[in-house]
């Protein structure tokens, strides 16, 4: 199976509500989305509200493996929030990530065709 799962614990200077945090995650657009790079996922992050998601078998291929799935967002006693993140280690992490970097470098003018 492919898939990297991360348990993430976060603090904020000003703690947002859970709903505000979910909205920010779902609406995030980085340079790849703004530049509409060919390999970039349309929506980089998907939030899954089910208690048992994300799961590798069900969610690793989100946006053809180039997106990130986040779920199980909860308030935490030591941190503001905790959640589980999932990405595809081969597509997003290696091969697809390298292609996306090359597309970004080309879009920014660092790489030109001869």
Task: List the predicted regions and their residue ranges.
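C-terminal substrate-binding/catalytic lobe of Rossmann-fold NAD(P)-dependent oxidoreductases
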Residues: 1-82
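Generic C-terminus detector
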Residues: 80-114
């Amino acid at each position: 199976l492919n898939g990297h799962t991360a348990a993430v614990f976060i603090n904020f200077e000003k703690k947002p509500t859970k709903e505000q945090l979910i909205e920010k995650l779902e609406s995030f657009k980085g340079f790849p989305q703004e530049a509409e790079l060919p390999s970039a996922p349309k929506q980089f992050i998907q939030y899954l509200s089910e208690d048992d998601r994300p799961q590798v078998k069900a969610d690793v291929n989100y946006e053809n493996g180039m997106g990130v799935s986040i779920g199980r967002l909860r308030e935490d006693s030591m941190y503001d929030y905790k959640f589980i993140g999932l990405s595809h280690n081969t597509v997003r992490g290696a091969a697809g990530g390298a292609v996306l970097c090359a597309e970004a470098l080309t879009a920014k003018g660092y790489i030109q065709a001869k």
